[in-house]
Amino acid sequence: MAIHPVEFRYGTPEMRVIWEAENKLQKMLDVEAALAQAEGELGIIPAEAASEIVRKASTEFVTLERVNEIERDTKHDIASLVKALAEQCEGDAGEYVHFGATSNDIVDTSNSLLLRDSISVLRDKLTRVLEVLLALADENRDRVCIGRTHGQHALPTTYGMKFAIWADEIHRQLERLDACSERLCVGMMTGAVGTTAALGEEGLEVHERVSEILGLRPVLISNQVVQRDNHAEFIMVLANIATTLDKIALEIRNLQRTEIMEVGEKFDPEKQVGSSTMPHKMNPITAERICGIARVIRSYVVAALENNPLWHERDLTNSSSERIILPEACILTDYILKLTLDVLCNLVFYPENIKRNLEFTGGLIMAERLMAELTRRGMGRQTAYAAVRQCAIEASRTGRSLRDVVLERSEIMDYLTVEDLEEIMNPETYIGSARRMVERVLEESQKWL
């Protein structure tokens, strides 16, 4: 019976299958097979035994049920796997299973295989999010909207700017994921304290050959574990990615507020229900889910950092933690990437509300432009600031437009014509270098994809 939400509610099939118990078992068997192959090639174990171990290192022969049955007695998962594999091997080949290895050689190296596959899935979705954001930036480079600081109307900006800023950040997250992957996905076959003592003089050759067979980079040095700064970095990168998605979703949620309603999630009025009691509700539930799950992913960072300081050459305190945080962090990050794609690919714009919000303050958002233009025409900057500020305060107090108040101020109108003022008060023409900035991101993105 499914209990955890990642089993039935949060997750994608392509990521769940990586972390399913049978696939994890197969990856551990793959490591045992690579060990036997390397030892057979180097003459450490008989070539016939190595071939038999490689042939039987499959869940076709070593079943999850049998491993679990043995573990009920041994209370040790890898010892149970070794016994289950050995009993499937013909002749005396089973006697050579796991020779020279320690349990964590199998665990850490198989985890690297799982994480490599997970990163591939994550990278594909991150790249797709980047592509969608770049397309939105291109399509909306001229869609002027109000920019907000401190929750208040500030200056005009464009939706193209919003999307381009997010695209640039997603690109940095891709770079971080690639960089940490190089350090994280390593092979290890170095024995109980990292010295390869049980393998004799060929120890380092076995270590390197196992990694080569599995397509991994051999770890340079280790004790009984690959050092957990790599795993902590990976979880922090996932938390960072989740936080970027959180930021995007949070902005969309805020822009979907009733009093703003500039953009919003797609809502199916024929089928979708917003509230069990309020028939009118159309809630941003997907964006809210992204934000909620991002909080969970960030919480894994503490556990990942706590897993780095272990006793001496190794203790087991990291193991139980990583059985939870590694699959869950991968599954949940992948899931909210999928949700982000759903939101962005179906984003609805409300142009009339965007225009309404640009005009909401009665021109107060153009105060900076007015001040700057007065300064360019000869009024001192401080004097211009004070004069425009007085007009803005008067407009706010009386509910009149800034334009109407300014028209009555001769000390300002001495520098302007009415036509000048009309142009100054047009928010559509006060977006600075926004268009060029978006174009720069679009041009630079040709190197990213």
Curated annotation (Swiss-Prot):
SUPFAM superfamilies: L-aspartase-like. InterPro entries: AdenyloSucc_lyase_C, Fumarase/histidase_N, Fumarate_lyase_CS, Fumarate_lyase_fam, Fumarate_lyase_N, L-Aspartase-like, Pur_lyase. The keyword Ribonucleoprotein does not apply. One of its GO terms (cellular component) is cytosol. It is an enzyme of class 4 (lyase). The keyword Lyase applies. The active site is at H150 (proton donor/acceptor), S275 (proton donor/acceptor). Keywords: Lyase, Purine biosynthesis. Pathway: Purine metabolism; AMP biosynthesis via de novo pathway; AMP from IMP: step 2/2; Purine metabolism; IMP biosynthesis via de novo pathway; 5-amino-1-(5-phospho-D-ribosyl)imidazole-4-carboxamide from 5-amino-1-(5-phospho-D-ribosyl)imidazole-4-carboxylate: step 2/2. Its EC number is 4.3.2.2. Catalyzes two reactions in de novo purine nucleotide biosynthesis. Catalyzes the breakdown of 5-aminoimidazole- (N-succinylocarboxamide) ribotide (SAICAR or 2-[5-amino-1-(5-phospho-beta-D-ribosyl)imidazole-4-carboxamido]succinate) to 5-aminoimidazole-4-carboxamide ribotide (AICAR or 5-amino-1-(5-phospho-beta-D-ribosyl)imidazole-4-carboxamide) and fumarate, and of adenylosuccinate (ADS or N(6)-(1,2-dicarboxyethyl)-AMP) to adenosine monophosphate (AMP) and fumarate. PANTHER family: ADENYLOSUCCINATE LYASE. Belongs to the lyase 1 family. Adenylosuccinate lyase subfamily. This is Adenylosuccinate lyase. It comes from Methanothermobacter thermautotrophicus (strain ATCC 29096 / DSM 1053 / JCM 10044 / NBRC 100330 / Delta H) (Methanobacterium thermoautotrophicum). The lineage of its organism: Archaea, Methanobacteriati, Methanobacteriota, Methanomada group, Methanobacteria.
